[in-house]
Amino acid sequence: MPAQPRPDRILHGSIPVETLRFGLPIAVGMGLQTVFNLVDAYIVSRLTPDVAGPALGAIGICDQLTAIGTILSYGLTTASTALIAQAHGRGDKAEVRRIAWQSMLAVTALSILFGFLSIGLAGPIVAGAVGAKGKVSELGTEYLRVIGGGSFSIYFLFQLTGIQRALGSAKTPVLLLVLSNVLNLFLAVLLVYGPGPAPPVFAWGPVIAEALHIPRLELVGAAWATVLARTLTLIPVVVLLARRFDVMGKGSITKPDPAMLKAILRMGWPSSAQFVVRMLAMLLTHSLVARIFTTATDQSATTALGIVFRLETMAFFIAMGWGSAAQTFVAQNLGAGQRGRARYSGVFSAIYSGVMLLLVAFAFARYGTPIVEFFDKSPTVVAISTTYIAYMVWSYVGLGTGVVLGSAITGSGATRTTLVTDLAVVLALQVPASIAAVLLPGASLPRLWTAIAIAYCASGIVYAIVFRFVRWMDAMTEAHVSDVAPP
């Protein structure tokens, strides 16, 4: 009989202690994932100067584009794992299996859709929609075709590790994500540099690449490394789900269940749309900077954004880690009828997230210049990047608070509440303020950074108000899937 994680601590342990015990490994693991991504960016930054700068800019743009698909997938993960955690809290094992399998079918369909879109429309998206120019556009198109075409790997990785977290396992999903990034680092050195040249720290790479006849692929090699690493990591993830968690036991693998899929999509689309709204706001920033502050021969501002957005992703992912913990605690405790514990788990998750993000903000504020110079020593790029850091880092606490409390709310199934909240902040404040910052007389990058920082702070304040005063836990009855008859 496969071993099952016991929900006793989540349902009966001390909330401050257990949210810390469960959430800290997830938050640290998510943060480490972005550290590996920064190392990936370092590998690209050590290509020849005519390629390195545009490549960093291209990665920054493509990260935001591919994040749209990842976030849509994450919405399905958020919905299905909340339902799985609720069923697990009720002790309904058959329901856990049924929701898990149907959610994987939904992720499969999304993978096919975004794979075709990325391969077929990469050029018009990068150059036309975003407004990338010159070498950035050329490299970004090649990169997007590979990383977007292989998007199934990250969709399934998040979905399957999310199921493990919903069942009460915090450390194993983190270790698997770290494994994926270690593989990514190893493969990136081989595929980006090929037989050489390579920086001294990666001198082992060209030796292996030459022995295996691996060509020098430069930026597109980084994309292939990422897709291959994630795909290889799926193997132990599937084995663990089948053997340890017994999710793929007898009777769980069935044909598509329209009623179940509809229930998952009904709950998941607002969560997806919520994060897509956030990502579109970041893409708007990229587009405004690319169109107004760059030329065909000088893409320094785009390169700078490519660097600082990767740093910002660390703060966002740490918050998402605490948010995942909050969602699991809220869902399982609501499933067991413990509303008070559900609410306090969200509060403590937000507090722990805020403390971690203050430490991150201090580190970036103190060491911002050497961090940026680690990737690009160009004076213009360094100046733009460090100005962004100075204006933005302390607002990450507000951004993280919004992410964590929003995730806690989605644990109850109230995904429409989080969607409306994000729409209000982004459409009523961030978008108009960003556009005004660059279109009104005296347009400047610092004014744009100020507008975004204010929006991040507002997000945390608004979510705190919603979490405290809106009756979001009442959505639990609407999200209950047990009323959907099994086939």
Residue locations for each model-derived region?
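Residue-level signal for short hydrophobic patches within transmembrane helices
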Residues: 12, 16-35, 39, 65-72, ...
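Transmembrane helical elements of multi-pass membrane transporters/channels
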Residues: 21-44, 146, 157, 229-233, ...
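Transmembrane alpha-helix boundary and packing residues in multipass membrane permease domains
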Residues: 26, 30, 42, 82, ...
